[in-house]
């Protein structure tokens, strides 16, 4: 499914904000509970450390802080849509987004959760952009937030070393496809025949993942999706200033970039410091890249993600030059 931006009406990114827990857990600490060590983890994932929430801190807590940061980044204090992409809602029912909106003082805003696992943020970006373009709303807060420490078995080496907790958000506003920050094209897809590759079994409490199978599917699918999205945006891949992929595994990012023939300096990666933060990974990477001066106003960004479901999605965005607001909480 594609959502191309027709005419001149469109959505633009005007702010970006993040929230990371204060607690840092490095590979040595993780290794104490597992048959592994820093060298093994780093060589296979590129991860050196991850963040973990304190007991009692929820996905909603992180989402509120990241959402407030994105609003502050854009110089706004309100919006009419809050879309929360997450696999770890605070409750099974009701959705977490309405409570997040209320805590942000947005009591009349539409709000709902979206579940597309690690593709969730790109799905949310696409849905919110389409709603703005259609005139359903004027300003939308898209938040990706996950607390995977709540669904990962600490004794499972295949998942315990991979995931971290965090949240990231962007503010989208009605604008023009020629404006800085424009979301030019998004593309989404899924394949339910692979739903067992990343799953929480019906009778289980923890996430399970078939890593080698996920790697193969992710590399092929992310490259195809990114290539198609760039073409629909009217870009040659050589025109892409920064490739911002889901931070699942450094090997995946490197392999996808090679297939797209993008040089390493154009690949945004912060997985070493935050690990795989699921729906939060792309906005966290965007904020870090902006804070470090790796992306600037007018840069062409190619975003792509792959997650459980199986789901995937990509977006072509012209960066607005928004200054990120990056916060922490316990």
From Swiss-Prot:
GO terms for biological process: fatty acid biosynthetic process; secondary metabolite biosynthetic process. The active site is at 118, 246, 276. Its main location: cytoplasm. Its EC number is 2.3.1.180. Residues 247-251 are annotated as: ACP-binding. InterPro entries: ACP_syn_III_C, ACP_syn_III_N, FabH, Thiolase-like. It catalyses: malonyl-[ACP] + acetyl-CoA + H(+) = 3-oxobutanoyl-[ACP] + CO2 + CoA. Homodimer. The last Arg residue of the ACP-binding site is essential for the weak association between ACP/AcpP and FabH. This is Beta-ketoacyl-[acyl-carrier-protein] synthase III 2. It comes from Streptomyces coelicolor (strain ATCC BAA-471 / A3(2) / M145).
């Amino acid at each position: 499914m594609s959502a191309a931006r027709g005419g001149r009406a469109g959505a633009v990114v005007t702010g970006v904000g993040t929230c990371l827990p204060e607690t840092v857990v490095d590979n040595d600490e993780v290794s104490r509970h597992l048959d592994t060590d820093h060298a093994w983890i780093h060589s296979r994932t590129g991860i050196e450390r991850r963040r973990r929430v304190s007991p009692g801190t929820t996905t909603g807590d992180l989402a509120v802080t990241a959402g407030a940061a994105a609003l502050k980044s854009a110089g706004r204090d309100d919006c009419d849509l809050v879309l929360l992409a997450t696999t770890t809602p605070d409750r099974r029912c009701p959705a977490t987004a309405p409570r997040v909106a209320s805590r942000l003082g947005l009591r009349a805003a539409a709000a709902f959760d979206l579940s597309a696992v690690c593709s969730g943020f790109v799905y949310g970006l696409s849905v919110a952009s389409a709603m703005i373009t259609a005139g359903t709303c004027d300003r939308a807060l898209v938040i990706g937030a996950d607390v995977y420490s709540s669904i990962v078995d600490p004794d499972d080496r295949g998942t315990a070393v991979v995931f971290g907790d965090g949240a990231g958000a962007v503010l989208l506003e009605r604008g023009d496809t020629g404006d800085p920050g424009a979301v030019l094209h998004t593309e989404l897809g899924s394949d339910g025949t692979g739903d067992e590759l990343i799953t929480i079994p019906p009778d289980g409490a923890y996430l399970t993942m078939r890593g080698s199978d996920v790697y193969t599917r992710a590399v092929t699918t992310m490259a195809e999706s990114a290539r198609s999205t760039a073409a629909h945006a009217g870009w040659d891949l050589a025109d892409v200033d920064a490739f911002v992929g889901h931070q699942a595994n450094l090997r995946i990012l490197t392999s996808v970039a090679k297939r797209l023939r993008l040089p390493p300096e154009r690949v945004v990666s912060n997985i070493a410091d935050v690990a795989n933060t699921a729906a939060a990974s792309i906005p966290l990477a965007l904020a870090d890249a902006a804070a470090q001066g790796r992306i600037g106003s007018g840069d062409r960004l190619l975003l792509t993600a792959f997650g459980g479901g199986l789901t995937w999605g990509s977006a072509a965005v012209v960066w607005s030059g928004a200054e990120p607001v990056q916060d922490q909480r316990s």
